Amino acid sequence: MFTLTGCRLVEKTQKVENPSVSFASSFPLIPLLLRGKSVQKKQAESKSQIKLHTQSAPFGLCPKDMMLTQAPSSVVRSRNSRNHTVNSGGSCLSASTVAIPAINDSSAAMSACSTISAQPASSMDTQMHSPKKQERVNKRVIWGIEVAEELHWKGWELGKETTRNLVLKNRSLKLQKMKYRPPKTKFFFTVIPQPIFLSPGITLTLPIVFRPLEAKEYMDQLWFEKAEGMFCVGLRATLPCHRLICRPPSLQLPMCAVGDTTEAFFCLDNVGDLPTFFTWEFSSPFQMLPATGLLEPGQASQIKVTFQPLTAVIYEVQATCWYGAGSRQRSSIQLQAVAKCAQLLVSIKHKCPEDQDAEGFQKLLYFGSVAVGCTSERQIRLHNPSAVNAPFRIEISPDELAEDQAFSCPTAHGIVLPGEKKCVSVFFHPKTLDTRTVDYCSIMPSGCASKTLLKVVGFCRGPAVSLQHYCVNFSWVNLGERSEQPLWIENQSDCTAHFQFAIDCLESVFTIRPAFGTLVGKARMTLHCAFQPTHPIICFRRVACLIHHQDPLFLDLMGTCHSDSTKPAILKPQHLTWYRTHLARGLTLYPPDILDAMLKEKKLAQDQNGALMIPIQDLEDMPAPQYPYIPPMTEFFFDGTSDITIFPPPISVEPVEVDFGACPGPEAPNPVPLCLMNHTKGKIMVVWTRRSDCPFWVTPESCDVPPLKSMAMRLHFQPPHPNCLYTVELEAFAIYKVLQSYSNIEEDCTMCPSWCLTVRARGHSYFAGFEHHIPQYSLDVPKLFPAVSSGEPTYRSLLLVNKDCKLLTFSLAPQRGSDVILRPTSGLVAPGAHQIILICTYPEGSSWKQHTFYLQCNASPQYLKEVSMYSREEPLQLKLDTHKSLYFKPTWVGCSSTSPFTFRNPSRLPLQFEWRVSEQHRKLLAVQPSRGLIQPNERLTLTWTFSPLEETKYLFQVGMWVWEAGLSPNANPAATTHYMLRLVGVGLTSSLSAKEKELAFGNVLVNSKQSRFLVLLNDGNCTLYYRLYLEQGSPEAVDNHPLALQLDRTEGSMPPRSQDTICLTACPKQRSQYSWTITYSLLSHRDNKAGEKQELCCVSLVAVYPLLSILDVSSMGSAEGITRKHLWRLFSLDLLNSYLERDPTPCELTYKVPTRHSMSQIPPVLTPLRLDFNFGAAPFKAPPSVVFLALKNSGVVSLDWAFLLPSDQRIDVELWAEQAELNSTELHQMRVQDNCLFSISPKAGSLSPGQEQMVELKYSHLFIGTDHLPVLFKVSHGREILLNFIGVTVKPEQKYVHFTSTTHQFIPIPIGDTLPPRQIYELYNGGSVPVTYEVQTDVLSQVQEKNFDHPIFCCLNPKGEIQPGSTARVLWIFSPIEAKTYTVDVPIHILGWNSALIHFQGVGYNPHMMGDTAPFHNISSWDNSSIHSRLVVPGQNVFLSQSHISLGNIPVQSKCSRLLFLNNISKNEEIAFSWQPSPLDFGEVSVSPMIGVVAPEETVPFVVTLRASVHASFYSADLVCKLYSQQLMRQYHKELQEWKDEKVRQEVEFTITDMKVKKRTCCTACEPARKYKTLPPIKNQQSVSRPASWKLQTPKEEVSWPCPQPPSPGMLCLGLTARAHATDYFLANFFSEFPCHFLHRELPKRKAPREESETSEEKSPNKWGPVSKQKKQLLVDILTTIIRGLLEDKNFHEAVDQSLVEQVPYFRQFWNEQSTKFMDQKNSLYLMPILPVPSSSWEDGKGKQPKEDRPEHYPGLGKKEEGEEEKGEEEEEELEEEEEEEEETEEEELGKEEIEEKEEERDEKEEKVSWAGIGPTPQPESQESMQWQWQQQLNVMVKEEQEQDEKEAIRRLPAFANLQEALLENMIQNILVEASRGEVVLTSRPRVIALPPFCVPRSLTPDTLLPTQQAEVLHPVVPLPTDLP
């Protein structure tokens, strides 16, 4: 045994428990197997590593080559799939080693054969002739034997034998015996077959030798035989082949975003025997690497799958790997991937107020104002809400030159993980001063997601440097003195400013310290200005202060120097002002003396400022010019030293810049000539200022220059030191000669400042070949010139910083042909100092032009730097996005539509634009804004508005003018650009409509909100703008009150072919029917007016309150004896229903739902409605009085109801907050609630419309006295009624009659009614003993006397007895004689108890005055409300289909029947029912059947019949039905029978008693139990005369052997009400209903002789008293004589005969013999051929019968009912009438021919008679015979008339009418019963099925007619009753 290593499974391998059995022990004939060949060497016994693969085995039952002789289901044992290792290289004598790892048992739960696979770790474990790689061996377990499915040989060689071992293992717990057959072919063989015996767990190795002879595949089978059947093992040898497999067979790639890439890997294994070349074939968007390759046997390659989708769909494709010879074999893998669109939400981090980040709008990222040259950073947030990675790219709109991009985003691309956020920085680095930069940043997710355009805006600000003063006046200074004044310079901006004054302080009389510097933001620096003149002269110099990134500032320095001999005029700032004015007017070229002379000669004049001007000769002359504003840059560059100047200079010097070059010495260089030229008309003196040690000087130092003359001078240079750099700016002042003496100035306005001349000279003293020192500097050079329009100069400032510790000289020289101007072009920069250089150019052309200049440092050519800048002339152009065409959508006439139009400014200048629409189109077209400013690189969207005037198509041409922004409003732009735009629009007409023309809210609860949606439709092709109006129709709207219907919006717009939804919210405030009309008008954008109103739809609503009603009431327990009618009054249900029908008051709606709102014991009452719920009275400790109320939601909305006790309305408070003292009322309520005297179940509920619910009210009689409890009955959002629960508990054996009220109202009776109805007044005995009542009728007599001795009130039974718990009916007759109200107070005495005075009240009315409003039948609302109710008690399984029957108004002596059903809803319980007889004081009520059984889930019909008496009266009865469970009754009868048997046994059994034994006095209950014990004797109970309702206060004698008691029955109560009217009054008021009622007349009953004698015996003594024998004998004699006389009297006999014969009616005198014959023949046609005796009297009688006497006019069920009964009766009558009509039609068709034949025969006879009359006179014999025939015919006719009279008399008999009514009633009952069972559908349409026609012989005889045809011809005759005479 050895341990397996190198396993791939996680589970630990198991050791083999049972060792293998040696093959030699079972098979001694091993040498036969070798067959003379050498035994193969045994494999080395080293422990080889074995790999266990986790590939699942196939789940098939058995391999195809396996055959079983028996059903495998009975013999194959299911086993788990395990992985085993088979050692096939060892000897046949060695035991096989098996590794059994633990694998999940569920992997092969459905497999009949276990699969086992194994694979060695390497091919080194196999023998020489074994395959290089062993395959997995699938094993199975069959009949307890574990064996491989097949043995597979691979890698074999021809002619060599290869052995594989077949391992069999016994997996069962019993000894296994089997046999096997050798393979059939000669290529596979094994040892000689012998029986195999395997013990449990033992393994057997069977060697199988394969010896091939040909290179082909071999297959065979090795069969095993067991007692259970046979099975086989496949033997297969295959050739080397190509085989590649993919693991796994399918590959699910991760979810990927569109445009992104994801990858996955799988293995491609070469499980074949040959090296295999493969090629992959796949489809987009999948890629596979490597796509081709070569795999050696056993080698695996990892394939990479790349997925890059282009659309968001689910991909499921198959990749195919082609391999093998000719690439004909293939292996495939299923690739599955899901592509989703990535989504990026862009937001701004750390938002500023100027930012815009709203959804649906342009996002704006505002950087604010950033200093030039600085960088600002803002961040945006990218959120990926999708489930995939979101790759993105960020692009900033590319400019034509990258150097001009002020915005940058280092994050050009990236990925945002699912659900995460990423922040991206955007930088703003402005380079152009005072410009607003706009750019657009596009954030583009990969794939199909839409990009987000982010607008970035920033403003570049520069320094804001200013001087304290712009003029420093030193006044006059003596020669040799020095004057100094302070001056501060300030930077008002927050960015750093570099400044420098353009003056050489060493060589100038004016000095500024410091001359250069740096100002940080918001800083100020003090400058020191000094004046030290060298000559007595007027000194004035305008010094420029150069500022980097700002226009230069100019500082005027002035001072006058006086000497002892020379005192020039003092220069003042006013002189400068006048000078500049004179410069603009051209007067500066004249010296002051000439100006004085001209002023004196009036050739010049002075203006209001004192400046000189040429006098104005004419008003039309132009005014004198003023000094213009000159931009600082222009003044700096064009100051007269160059070819271009603003004003001509008065004096100039050339050259202004001199370069001496290298002057190493020792000889001085040649001086450079200078030319000084005077352009004025006066003599000028020029003086050069020079310090003594300056290496540069000019000779002569001073000189005078005549007017318009020039002077030559020389510039000298003498470097004092070798190898040095020298640069200097020489200064000279030129002044008019006359100004040297102030006395020469007569007019101060002619004063003129001096002019300052400068010459910049440079040179160095470096020897040739000596290297100049290396400069260290930085040069801030922008790449682009600022944007300017055509013809305008553009300027830039450069900053040169000397970072070295030595001096730095520079010189700037533009490239040849370059048109840039540099100032200064040379200079000296001190160590650490900076030099500001200004550059100017005039751009030309719209394309970028490069400007190149060279910077040379330290006068060395090797330190030359080329600098390039670009400029262009900015074009005035815009880019239009719509290709100069714009289309409007179709627009409604009168309305407007808009269309956006976007254009972009590609230039770097802000442009002004203006749209110009012609005057005729301004009513149709409008644009907003029509003019405006568009910043550089900005996109601007305009809105065009199209307003058509008519239904047509429009075409417009509109122009847009563009010019440079920044011009004054009145200035005309120098250049403009013109664009034309084409606009197309269509005007249409349309209208709105509503999807529903009538919108009904239905029923809505008052004060509640309900919403409906109104769908508007726009079926047109244009957008409509509408406004809705709401008008209330009913009820009328009240001013200043909001409407009950609100619209969520009243205005809106609808696109074409669309619909819009308006939410309507209704909140009615009162109960009413609301109606509204919604109209609309279309809005016009032109004049902002609404069009004509048009109706849109109608809205209706019914505002209701919840409506609850009480349908029925029933009682149980102690209240069981109270009638339902009386109970209805006790609970004031009529008044309660009337209250519930009314609207609630506002106080009742204070709390719309049940709420705890009170802190007191008695909560406040918010309702004015109060009612009594009187539970009646019952004795102490009697069963509770239980009342069931049937509640119904009679409304149309759902409702919630609740009974709230005082405790339910009270807020729970702490004990310390409770009220300390309670009054008697509170204490009483607490006692009632704590003891639960009144209980309600359930206390609350919800009811849907039409739903009913039963509520149980219970009152427990636990305390003697009267109990009260206020209960609030609350209907949510409805009524709130206070119910006063009242209950009375009576002491035992106390008399008590419960009077509900002291007043009683009789039913109103019409006056003149001779037979007023009987009315009922009920008295209920609530005590436990019988009571006797007595009505005192004396007061009734008094009322009678007052009313003309007419009995207004009459009590029919003024005295009677009331049993405990029952109700007595006191009958009254109220008979008014006047239309008024009668009242009487009648005392009712309860004998032995109290008396009560009852106030009776009756109303008499005149029926002729009231008409139809006369209340003929108004018992109570219980009469109608409970007709269709069904009050179901909890636990009740049987119920009535109707709990109340209201017959309404009926005539007296009528019989009314109703069919009802008894339903058993139980599924397994049979119920027996028994109706209790309910006797009435008048009339009769019966139920049929009285008893019966209702099967489970069955229905039993029964009929309730009321037979009204002859008296007009009110009927009110409660019919009680007792219900018994059949199962309990059987048990009861069984126990009763056992009890009777035991009773009989005890009666025959006797006991011998030992008299000597003392009577036991101890308790028998303590005796020990004995096996047998004689039962005590049964004693007869004494009849109890006490009431049965008495409780257990009276001890009862214990029954020795109690008799089983029957089970307590369930009770069902059926109420019946009716009002019987006298026949005359019923006909007068209900004439149309009279035929619907059947008048039941009782038949005279014949008594038996015995009964008659008994009756006579009973009545005679009471009526006559005792009679003597003499009187009896006398009476007999007298009567005998009289009777004998009558028998002998003939006159008496004749009189009797005449009285029996009916008198001849008056119409008999019109008798005609011929008509009689004709009628006789006509009536006998139908019956004579069939019946032997003519009986046409039946038909005659039927035809003469009055309509009201026919059977169909006496329906058995009385008045037609509602519902199914009424429909059933009507349809049954229709069916009967149709059948009768069909029968009559058939009879007419059958007898038609016969009638025609009879008529022809009769006509022939008549003709014969007439002809006979004309002929000769007959003989007397013929006349006698004719007379005899006539006599016979007359006798027949008389006989027929007598029979007809008899039939008519029979029909008028009550018995016949009763029989007809019984038959019809039975038929209708059968139909309704069948309909209730579903056998007949009464509501279906009637169908008439015509019978097939048949031929009837012309002559009908009884023999020719079949029996069925006879039945069709004859009418059925109703049999008569047998009791008729």
From Swiss-Prot:
Residues 1645-1667, 1736-1823 are annotated as: Disordered. It is a single-pass membrane protein; Single-pass type I membrane protein. Pfam families: Ig_CFAP65 (PF24291), Ig_CFAP65_4th (PF24507), Ig_CFAP65_7th (PF25249), Ig_CFAP65_8th (PF25248), Ig_CFAP65__9th (PF24816). Residues 1525-1550 form a coiled coil. GO terms for cellular component: acrosomal membrane; acrosomal vesicle; cytoplasm; plasma membrane; sperm flagellum; sperm midpiece. Residues 1649-1661, 1739-1762 have a biased composition (Basic and acidic residues). InterPro entries: CFAP65, Ig-like_fold, Ig_CFAP65_10th, MSP_dom. Residues 877-986 form the MSP domain. The keyword Coiled coil applies. Changing residue 1016 to R: In SPGF40; uncertain significance. Keywords: Cell membrane, Cell projection, Cilium, Cilium biogenesis/degradation, Coiled coil, Cytoplasm, Cytoplasmic vesicle, Disease variant, Flagellum, Membrane, Transmembrane, Transmembrane helix. Disulfide bonds: none annotated. One of its GO terms (biological process) is flagellated sperm motility. Residues 1763-1804 have a biased composition (Acidic residues). The keyword Isomerase does not apply. One of its GO terms (molecular function) is RNA binding. The chain crosses the membrane at residues 188-208. It is found in: Cell projection, Cilium, Flagellum membrane; Cytoplasmic vesicle, Secretory vesicle, Acrosome membrane; Cytoplasm. It is linked to Spermatogenic failure 40: An autosomal recessive infertility disorder characterized by severely reduced or absent sperm motility, due to multiple morphologic anomalies such as absent, short, bent, coiled and irregular-caliber tails. Patient spermatozoa may also show morphologic defects of the sperm head. Belongs to the CFAP65 family. Plays a role in flagellar formation and sperm motility. Interacts with CFAP47. This is Cilia- and flagella-associated protein 65. The gene is CFAP65.
